[in-house]
Amino acid sequence: YERSQRNTDRYRALQAEGYNKQQIDSVFNTPVRMRVFSWNNPIDTIMSPMDSIKYYYWFLRSGLMAMEPHTGYVKAYVGGPDYRYFKYDQVKYAARQVGSTFKPFVYTMAMQEKGYKPCSEIPKIQPSIELWDGSIWAPANANKDKIGEMVTLKWALANSDNWISAHLMKEISPQSVIDLARKMGVTSPIDPVPSLCLGTAEITLCEMVGAFNTYPSQGVYVEPIFVSRIEDKYGNVLENFVPNRTQAMNEETAYTMLRTMQGVVEGGTSVRLQYRYNLRNPIAGKTGTTQNHSDGWFIGMTPYLTAGVWTGAEFRSIHFRSITYGQGAHMALPIWALFMQKVYDDPTINMPKDDFPKPMSGYDVNFDCSQENLNKWIEEF
């Protein structure tokens, strides 16, 4: 608890007054009257400052950010539960493992470099990848369906299958995926290792929302803009802010990935958006869950809004016991869904529920994998 103690205003004030470590510890272990956070209303109580630090450890934190695809304007931003008690921005500064929300970047590179399509089939078997030191990395897989069968990329992403992501990473390279992530606005340090395909990198929610926003922006990364302009008291514009833009991928790949990620919502890990929250308009997205169920993610996209949610405790050692509740579909997706319900119900926003527009080139790709595979079987027969 020492690091948390040193980060408090109380500790810094005592240190500035010349207290030594022993004196500071004595103050922190002496009960005093204080007001602490609770989900209903703040509670007036008596406890030691050290006990209050331990008390706050058990609260889940969450962050949310939403932005417009083409303008980059940030429309909603929640850095934590209550800034009076949790003075840390979980959106901009908290870099956490991203889990399966990183998989779309791997799929994007596989489509760009290797020509994969949503209905391309890969055998669902455990891949083995030789590492630089000669050891073998063979990832585990929580998904036990269709082992040994041929599965489509659309199915694999919808069900967040680890083996297929690792198979794709084996065909491309970690560095090529990192290069793509950089074009999509990710600046956090990333190690070029095969396990990157499962989301071992630690990245902020702000970066991830900005990166996902590339897909509904026709492959163009648009830097998130928090302030559009600055005016003086007379209304004179002192500064205008225009987002930086980078062509991260071609429009056709972006559209293909959007449609592939719609499968996550229509019949994969995010299907509860439809049946539990009645969000039946076109939505593409991806859940993410990290080791020991410490972090839950969901990033969802519509043609007019990209929003992401992260949920977890301040320290990874505090987490859910099992994946029953310790997964992105339970930890983060409900927040996203309730937020979007409010957006659609607000007449002042008047958010349309249109489908994602097709590329201007007229490009289209088949997403009805059952029909495509039937046609393939007939041709072979």
Regions found by a protein language model. Name each.
Residues 89, 93-133, 267, 341:
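Active-site rim segments in enzyme catalytic domains, especially the processed small/beta chain
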Residues 93, 163-165, 193-195:
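Short, solvent-exposed beta-strand edge segments and adjacent coil->beta transition regions
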Residues 136-141, 172-210, 219, 223-226:
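Mid-domain, small-residue-enriched loop/turn segments at the edges of structured enzyme/sensor domains
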Residues 116-177, 221, 233-258, 262:
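Conserved catalytic neighborhood of penicillin-recognizing serine enzymes
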Residues 1-68, 77, 83-91, 102, ...:
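A penicillin-recognizing enzyme superfamily signal
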Residues 59-61, 151, 193:
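Short coil/loop residues immediately preceding or within conserved phosphate-binding loops
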